[in-house]
Amino acid sequence: MAGLLSTFDTFSSRRSESINKSGGGAVIPGQKSTVSVFVLGPSVTDDADKLFIATTFLAHSLNTDKQHSQRGGFLVSLLAMAYSSPELYLTTNGVNADVKYVIYNIEKDPKRTKTDRFIVKTRDMEYERTTEWLFGPMVNKSPLFQGQRDAADPDTLLQTYGYPACLGA
């Protein structure tokens, strides 16, 4: 685990130069100056759900599409999820007056059939388009899952990509 954290530290310090220009983080489409940090809400307790969300975020972080230019933010969100501490992200990267920080909760909603029963929300609002973008069909087509997202297991992912590849290093 120590090696994993040091890789994150290195990756984070490499990104610190561009934080003032782009806002860093997982910049979702249409919110260029917003740092979006995703954390797990209290309704996500099952280990299988946590693994699913982690692999989904890895798929986004490995995606080289233009919309995913801030893919490092997904990895930082993963770290924030692991420690239940979004403040970790905000203090690591400093503060920028021009950038708005938004902390999104990922919650489990049993009434939903799409998006694997997850919803992205803040205290005030549910974000349907962001939920669709994060958990929608694009992710299942990722080479990480090869169309079999539900069957992905951590050992296979690590053997295929290794920690450095999964961390974007």
UniProtKB/Swiss-Prot annotation:
Q: Which domain of life is it from?
A: Viruses
**Where the protein is mainly located, per its record?**
virion
Q: Where in the cell is it found?
A: Virion; Host cytoplasm
Decide whether keyword Ribonucleoprotein is in the record.
Answer: yes
Establish whether keyword Metal-binding is in the entry: no
GO biological process terms held by the UniProt record: negative stranded viral RNA replication
Query: Which Gene Ontology terms of cellular component type are present?
Result: host cell cytoplasm; protein-containing complex; ribonucleoprotein complex; viral nucleocapsid
Q: Which UniProt keywords apply?
A: Host cytoplasm, Ribonucleoprotein, RNA-binding, Viral nucleoprotein, Virion
The UniProt GO MF terms for this protein read: protein domain specific binding; RNA binding
Q: What does its UniProt record remark on the domains? A: Ncore is globular and carries regions required for self-assembly and RNA-binding. Ntail is an intrinsically disordered monomeric domain in the C-terminus.
Misc remark:
Most abundant protein in the virion. Since the viral RNA genome consists of 15,383 bases,there are 2564 molecules per encapsidated genome.
Its quaternary organisation is: Homomultimer; forms the nucleocapsid. Binds to the viral genomic RNA. N0 interacts with the phosphoprotein (via N-terminus); this interaction allows P to chaperon N0 to avoid N polymerization before encapsidation. Interacts as N-RNA template with the phosphoprotein (via C-terminus); this interaction positions the polymerase on the template.
Function of this protein? Answer: Forms the helical nucleocapsid (NC) in a ratio of 1 N per 6 ribonucleotides, protecting the genome from nucleases. The encapsidated genomic RNA serves as template for transcription and replication; encapsidation by N is coupled to RNA synthesis. Forms the encapsidation complex with the phosphoprotein protein P. Before encapsidation, the newly synthesized free N protein, so-called N0, is chaperoned by P.
Q: Which family does it belong to?
A: Belongs to the paramyxoviruses nucleocapsid family.
Q: What is this protein called?
A: Nucleoprotein
Write down the species. Sendai virus (strain Harris)
